[in-house]
From Swiss-Prot:
Residues 68-77 have a biased composition (Polar residues). GO terms for biological process: DNA-templated transcription initiation; nitrogen fixation. This is RNA polymerase sigma-54 factor. One of its GO terms (cellular component) is DNA-directed RNA polymerase complex. Keywords: DNA-binding, DNA-directed RNA polymerase, Nitrogen fixation, Nucleotidyltransferase, Sigma factor, Transcription, Transcription regulation, Transferase. It comes from Azotobacter vinelandii. Gene3D superfamilies: Homeodomain-like, RNA polymerase sigma-54 factor, core-binding domain. Transmembrane segments: none annotated.
């Protein structure tokens, strides 16, 4: 068979750069999107924030009619179209409606394309005082090491001992425990100093007198003893608590109260205040000072109740409203093929697509959020126990999109409700069959389990089998292993570890 050229007609799907951009913006979190918008504003002179438009409100900059066009990235308020003051890509002026000639009314973000962009953590740009800040964790602004070094500088000590102290402080972790053995710390010191192990131990004891109480301990028992030694000598049951912390901490951890009473030769009513004294201590003393970086969550959607109806709206403060800069757009001329004019036309087209991508993202987010609220009105009214089963397919079918699109739009997107701020994925859960043939959400079952355990007798905590039986009485058929899985997901210990003295 001879090789030959064959001409065929066919169709294939192509991932255009504009579609890639739309999908990338769709899956970004609000903080990442703010960073992306800022980069676009810095690199594209055709884009500007709507609040910056005041600089161009004079007739001299907008042309004789003084009209300006705003492309609002907020759904429901998109005013597109230039008047006589701007020019089209091909030259001349842009008549109203010409903005849509090269931009489809809907971006086809519904696609199975998965790997265009890998999101990464980004810093939040500088914000105004009134920007949303719902869930900021407060920070003391001081590390544990700096707090201990500050106390060290106030402590009279020889230069050699001070060097040992600094080495010890460097080996204390964020919980306040000494991570390295004293032999390792001794080996790290200069041999010419002639330091002995007992000198390192002596310096450690001085550091253990610093605040917070219990610092620089080598294990939990030593930390508790250090805290007990700083209590007033007349503290009730102090000596018994020291004995318990030193010799019987493992029995307390295993909730073996019978053996604990036998070993300490105490009655139940005597052991109870001893345990209460131990429980008043801090097992992680360093956490009082050490704090992690503040975590910020900016809600994308706000849900509120008005006249017995749940209303869904985008957080207007989360994403700035953008528009085409009419001043620069007015410089574009039809027949000018110069490099500068070509650059301006390309920047104008990129700005159009960027604004359209933001519009598409916001519209998709609104559609999905509205459907979630529609499905989970019971949760908003009554709490977790009223949560309904919901999977991605249910929302995808309701809004007419692919499940992969719903997955993107619900990842790292947050909804602010009267009950708190939740990631959109929180509202999705699997279902468990009920005795009546209905379905119950796994989230609702977790809430019921949590409620049952909170109301249990501390001396006789509910076992997983007993909880499964109580759920069955409510018409929810759940196996014991499923109860154990739900309990562990709630970070609740098994019944043997929940048992305590009354």
């Amino acid at each position: 068979m001879k090789p030959s050229l064959v001409l065929k007609m066919g169709q294939q799907l192509t991932m255009t750069p504009q579609l890639q951009q739309a999908i990338r913006l769709l899956q970004l979190s609000t903080l990442d999107l703010q960073q992306e918008i800022q980069e676009a504003l810095d690199s594209n002179p055709m884009l500007e924030r709507q609040e910056d438009a005041e600089d161009y409100d004079s007739p001299d900059m907008l042309g004789e009619h003084g009209d300006q066009s705003t492309l609002d990235t907020t759904p429901g308020s998109y005013q597109e179209g230039y008047e006589s003051g701007a020019a089209s890509e091909d030259g001349g002026t842009l008549e109203e409606g010409d903005w849509h000639e090269r931009i489809p009314s809907e971006l086809p973000v519904d696609t199975a394309w998965e790997d265009i962009y890998q999101t990464s953590a980004s810093n939040l740009p500088s914000t105004d005082e009134d920007e949303w800040d719902f869930t900021t964790r407060t920070s003391t602004g001081e590390s544990l090491q700096s707090h201990l070094l500050w106390q060290l500088n106030l402590t009279p000590m020889s230069d050699t001992d001070r060097l040992i102290a600094v080495t010890l402080i460097d080996s204390i972790n964020s919980d306040g425990y000494l991570e390295a053995a004293l032999e390792e710390i001794l080996a790290s010191l200069d041999p010419e100093l002639g330091v002995e192990l007992d000198e390192v131990e002596m310096v450690l004891r001085r550091i253990q007198q610093f605040e917070p109480a219990g610092i620089a301990a080598r294990d939990l028992s030593e930390s508790l003893l250090l805290q007990l030694r700083q209590l007033p000598p007349d503290t009730p049951w102090l000596e018994e608590a020291k004995r318990l912390a030193k010799d019987y901490l493992d029995l307390l951890g295993n909730r073996d109260f019978t053996q604990l009473m036998r070993r300490m030769k105490l009655k139940e009513e005597e052991l109870r205040p001893v345990i209460e004294l131990i429980q008043s201590l801090n097992p992680r003393p360093g956490a009082q000072i050490e704090s992690s970086e503040p975590e910020y969550v900016v809600p994308d959607v706000i849900v509120r109740k008005h006249n017995d109806r749940w209303l869904v709206e985008l957080n207007q403060e989360a994403v700035p409203r953008l528009r085409i800069n009419p001043h620069y757009a007015g410089f574009i001329r039809r027949a000018d093929a110069s490099a500068d004019n070509t650059f301006m036309r390309n920047q104008l087209q990129e700005a159009r697509w960027f604004i359209k991508s933001l519009q598409s993202r916001n519209e998709t987010l609104m559609k999905v959020s509205t459907q979630i609220v529609e499905h989970q009105r019971g949760f908003l009214d009554y709490g977790e126990e009223a949560m309904k089963p919901l999977v991605l397919h249910d929302i995808a079918e309701a809004v007419g999109m692919h499940e992969s699109t719903i997955s993107r739009v619900t990842t790292q997107k947050y909804m602010h409700t009267p009950r708190g701020i939740y990631e959109l994925k929180y509202f999705f859960s699997s279902h468990v069959s009920t005795a009546e043939g209905g379905e119950c959400s796994s989230t609702a079952i977790r809430a019921i389990i949590k409620k049952l355990i909170a109301a249990e007798n501390p001396k006789k905590p509910l076992s997983d089998s007993k909880i499964a039986g109580l759920l069955e009485e409510q018409g929810i058929q759940v196996a014991r292993r499923t109860v154990a899985k739900y309990r562990e997901s709630l970070s609740i210990a098994p019944s043997s570890e929940r048992k305590r003295l009354m």
